[in-house]
Amino acid sequence: MNLHEYQAKDLLESYGLKVQKGIVAHNPNEAAQAFDQLGGKFAVVKAQVHAGGRGKAGGVKVVKSSQEAREVAESLIGKNLVTFQTDAEGQPVNSVGVFEDVYPVTRELYLGAVVDRSSRKVTFMASTEGGVDIEEVAHNSPEKILKVEVDPLVGLQPFQAREVAFKLGLEGKQINDFVKTMLGAYKAFIECDFALFEINPLAVRENGEIVCVDGKINLDSNALYRHPKLLALRDKSQENAKELKASEHELNYVALKGNIGCMVNGAGLAMATMDIIQLYGGKPANFLDVGGGATKERVIEAFKLILDDENVKAVLINIFGGIVRCDMIAEAIIEAVKEVNVTVPVVVRLEGNNAEKGAKILADSGLKLIPADGLADAADKVVKSLG
């Protein structure tokens, strides 16, 4: 689950980090009032959306008066912002953040952390190349990114943060401020179950003060039951409507740009299914994992979700029966096909627990379903069904 910038900054500030002061505004008048309340000569109005690249897309503007703040807010709120990280429709802008002007600054740094699956540790990354896309830095100048793996038994130690500060070229009080920032960020990461966080840029002001000018936080969705206050910050308007609907039925769904709908149980099998569709010349329209303990109702909802995509011209159902019985899947498929007006070819491959029984149920249903014997046969048939 992603947080908006203003929410991320509020959370980081509660852990002792110095952040760029700001006020969220939901309409132009509130934006004008926020400018006056901040009391500076300048302010920065930023569209609050769950996407990067806002500046290049016109979602970040420097304003010099409350009237300018009102005008910029009016041009953003209620519109969709299209960036390199969004789809063609963009993300809806329901609010803007009006932030204090912290510039000029002497340096822009980068500080971030992720859960590194390979090392199974929280790994911090820091760089002198702040204010730019960190992926670009990693590609062009990987030597400019410092990495610190944190031992989960003892946590991030002050000496590790000091070492990073030295390598970033910080001096005097800046070192202590950076250590405080990094330690506070780690504490927030662990206590709030972050999956990812970034401060880009982490600015060094002319007076030596270190300030978080931006903030990006992604929370581990599997841990949200432990954080009801953070869950309350969820902005469903920023989420893909189909993916949101899928999550309500405990389905793992990701929309893609192909025309072959996929329903599979198990993430690994789902990825293998997408790969073999691609191998046979097809294009998957989605990733959809109904889970190892899929119920009849969940399968029906998954089928509806796939067919709700107008780009889907054929469907491949690939089920390996373990905990999930293939006969139950077969009954759910029949019920879903009867309930939804299916006008596209449906290829079904069942293997494992009660597979023969499931195949017989489908064969006796009288529905125009295409049985497949094996994964390769299923991929071949679904691609050929497109004509």
From Swiss-Prot:
Pathway: Carbohydrate metabolism; tricarboxylic acid cycle; succinate from succinyl-CoA (ligase route): step 1/1. InterPro entries: ATP-grasp, ATP-grasp_succ-CoA_synth-type, ATP_grasp_subdomain_1, Succ-CoA_synthase_bsu_CS, SUCC_ACL_C, Succ_CoA_ligase-like_bsu, Succinyl-CoA_synth-like. GO terms for cellular component: cytosol; succinate-CoA ligase complex. Mg(2+) binds at residues 200, 214. GO terms for biological process: succinyl-CoA metabolic process; tricarboxylic acid cycle. ATP binds at residues 46, 53-55, 100, 103, 108. Substrate binds at residues 265, 322-324. It catalyses: succinate + ATP + CoA = succinyl-CoA + ADP + phosphate; GTP + succinate + CoA = succinyl-CoA + GDP + phosphate. PANTHER family: SUCCINATE--COA LIGASE [GDP-FORMING] SUBUNIT BETA, MITOCHONDRIAL, SUCCINYL-COA SYNTHETASE BETA CHAIN. Succinyl-CoA synthetase functions in the citric acid cycle (TCA), coupling the hydrolysis of succinyl-CoA to the synthesis of either ATP or GTP and thus represents the only step of substrate-level phosphorylation in the TCA. The beta subunit provides nucleotide specificity of the enzyme and binds the substrate succinate, while the binding sites for coenzyme A and phosphate are found in the alpha subunit. One of its GO terms (molecular function) is magnesium ion binding. Belongs to the succinate/malate CoA ligase beta subunit family. This is Succinate--CoA ligase [ADP-forming] subunit beta. Its cofactor is Mg(2+). Heterotetramer of two alpha and two beta subunits.
